[in-house]
């Protein structure tokens, strides 16, 4: 659920930046609200990645998406919407995230991840820590009785399913933007993915928006260019392009 939430937020934010730049609105949307126009927009789901940019590329922070990571979004939703829905005081809810990355422990302590002194997520367990706890408790999953899946906020979509693989966030965000602008799903054959020669961990993709809904007519014919990388070598190369103003991506 929260992966879908992140995808919708990031996709909508990217669309807002494209609108502001291509419609010549400058730093405000049609309602006069401020809009970050920095392109390319960079995903903000990894706390380790955020820390790297803060230290190595502090002048490029405007390029980061304003979106929280999925598990901190979920924590915020649980302590607001879910708390209200169930009649529970937010202070009586304790949110624990099970994550594969130890940097998530640091992430939940950042000041951006709390409101009025209330953390979005109270604790993080790594998957390895959870596995140890399961073994210590002697839980035998093979012989546990069947139970119903608990989905208090609904199920996820296919876009959320690919979220965890390299490039999954980008593909999901592109799908969202394309569907918002055209009213149709993104045909996979229209997504042209190209590896960068000599750097296998970086790949680029482009999609040309051929037809649009009336309100997005200014995006007709626009080709959106994106890049995906795994590892800091490729990421640093892309960030250097951003820093020197030669990045061709959105």
Mark where each language-model region is:
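Iron-sulfur-associated redox domains of electron-transfer enzymes in respiratory
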Residues: 1-250
């Amino acid at each position: 659920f929260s992966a879908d939430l992140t995808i919708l937020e990031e996709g909508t934010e990217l669309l807002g930046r494209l609108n502001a730049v291509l419609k010549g609105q400058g730093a405000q949307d049609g309602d006069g609200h401020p809009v970050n126009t920095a392109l390319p927009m960079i995903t903000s789901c990894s706390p380790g990645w955020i820390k790297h940019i803060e230290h190595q590329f502090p002048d490029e922070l405007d390029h980061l998406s304003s979106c929280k990571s999925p598990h901190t979004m979920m924590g915020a939703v649980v302590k607001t919407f879910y708390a209200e829905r169930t009649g529970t005081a937010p202070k009586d809810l304790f949110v624990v995230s099970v994550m594969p990355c130890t940097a998530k422990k640091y992430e939940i302590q950042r000041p951006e991840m709390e409101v009025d002194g209330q953390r979005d997520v109270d604790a993080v367990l790594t998957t390895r820590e959870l596995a140890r706890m399961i073994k210590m408790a002697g839980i035998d999953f093979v012989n546990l009785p069947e139970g119903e899946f608990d989905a208090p906020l609904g199920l996820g979509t296919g876009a959320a399913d690919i979220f965890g693989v390299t490039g999954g966030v980008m593909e999901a965000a592109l799908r969202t933007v394309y569907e918002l602008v055209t009213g149709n799903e993104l045909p996979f054959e229209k997504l042209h993915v190209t590896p960068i020669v000599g750097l296998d961990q970086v790949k680029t993709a482009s999609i040309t928006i051929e037809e649009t809904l009336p309100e997005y007519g200014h995006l007709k014919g626009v080709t959106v260019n994106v890049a995906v990388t795994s590892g800091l070598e490729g990421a640093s190369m892309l960030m250097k392009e951003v820093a020197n103003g030669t990045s061709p991506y959105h």
